[in-house]
UniProtKB/Swiss-Prot annotation:
Cofactors (names): Mg(2+)
Task performed by this protein: Catalyzes the transfer of a dimethylallyl group onto the adenine at position 37 in tRNAs that read codons beginning with uridine, leading to the formation of N6-(dimethylallyl)adenosine (i(6)A).
Organism (species): Cronobacter sakazakii (strain ATCC BAA-894)
Coiled coil segments of this chain: none
The keyword tRNA processing is annotated on this UniProt entry: yes
The encoding gene: miaA
Residues flagged as site, Interaction with substrate tRNA: 108, 130
Official protein name in the record: tRNA dimethylallyltransferase
């Protein structure tokens, strides 16, 4: 398999999909038969000490197929799409320099988009404006601020849930700083990706099956010690619910349980529901994605063969 395309650009492979869709298993198999190196594209897997609730590949899987961009920051640190793009481009260049092909696998669609299309220059955070937004939220509630965003930027308001204060605050902040909406600014893409990319999306054909998998996996996480993992983070004392790490699906629900805000059963219910909602958002992103080849996760042999056929590799 040639690692340079007919266009003269180096090849890269994107393997995208919702949570619990079998991405990791397929990526590991491809790693065993193709000259590829794996790069994780997941905003939760970057955090150290967050292994069970993120379904991070285990030691055995990583010994078969090492992943770059896993365990690179502490949960107290921030990691943006711009940080990811910088780190992924560096990793891709190193992989190509070694004569291999980058295989990027994960479910953080914003990261894939940032890598593929580049990032528009958004204004830096302004603590004064951020504080004013927080003050208004305390007085009027986040629902009122969501209605305000609907007037300013209806496209962003449709995408951002009223219960997501972090993204809601940022959308308003960008407008108050720049006078331009988040939608306007993000339509101006930055530098495109200098690779010929083969894009794949893997998911079960049935939504019910995906929901069933999500529920099973959440219970497996609990049986594997997820509560103890989050309890250790909770006990640190320097983490709080405004941080992206604590807001990860599953973690924020367990955090609420440990804080005494909800019962154990409610935590399980909310955790499963939140994971299903995440999967729905991921699939919605992918349905609007251009140039993607769909793979059925319930037919792993066929999915594997389809990837090889599209990228022009011989069946192993």
């Amino acid at each position: 398999m040639n690692d340079v395309s007919k266009t003269g650009l180096p090849k890269a492979i994107f393997l995208m999909g919702p949570t619990a869709s079998g991405k990791t298993a397929l990526a590991i198999r491809l790693r065993q038969t193709l000259p590829v190196e794996l790069i994780s594209v997941d905003s939760a897997l970057v955090y150290k000490g967050m292994d069970i609730g993120t379904a991070k590949p285990d030691a055995h899987e990583l010994s078969q197929a090492p992943h770059r961009l896993l365990d690179i920051i502490d949960p107290a640190q921030a990691y943006s799409a711009a940080d990811f793009r910088r780190d992924a481009l560096q990793a891709m260049a190193e992989i190509v320099a070694a004569g291999r092909i980058p295989l990027l696998v994960g479910g953080t669609m914003l990261y894939f988009k940032a890598l593929l299309e580049g990032l528009s220059p958004l204004p830096s955070a302004d603590p004064t404006i951020r504080a004013e937004i927080e003050r208004q939220a305390a007085e009027q509630g986040w629902d009122a601020l969501h209605r305000k965003l609907q007037d300013i930027d209806p496209v962003a308001a449709q995408r951002i849930h009223p219960n997501d204060p972090q993204r809601l605050s940022r959308a308003l902040e960008v407008f108050f700083i720049s006078g331009k909406t988040l939608t306007e600014l993000t339509q101006t893409s930055g530098e495109a990706l200098p690779y010929q990319v083969h894009q794949f999306a893997i998911a079960p054909a049935s939504r019910e099956l995906l929901h069933q998998r999500i529920e099973q996996r959440f219970h497996q996480m609990l049986a594997s010690g997820f509560e103890a993992e989050v309890r250790a983070l909770f006990a640190r004392g320097d983490l709080h619910t405004d941080m992206p790490s604590v807001r990860c699906v599953g973690y924020r629900q367990m955090w609420s349980y440990l804080a005494g805000e909800i019962s154990y059963d409610e935590m399980v219910y909310r955790g499963i529901c939140a994971t299903r909602q995440l999967a729905k958002r991921q699939i919605t992103w992918l349905r609007g994605w251009e140039g993607v080849h769909w793979l059925d996760s319930e037919k792993p042999e066929q999915a594997y063969s389809d990837v090889l056929q599209v990228i022009g590799a011989k069946q192993q």
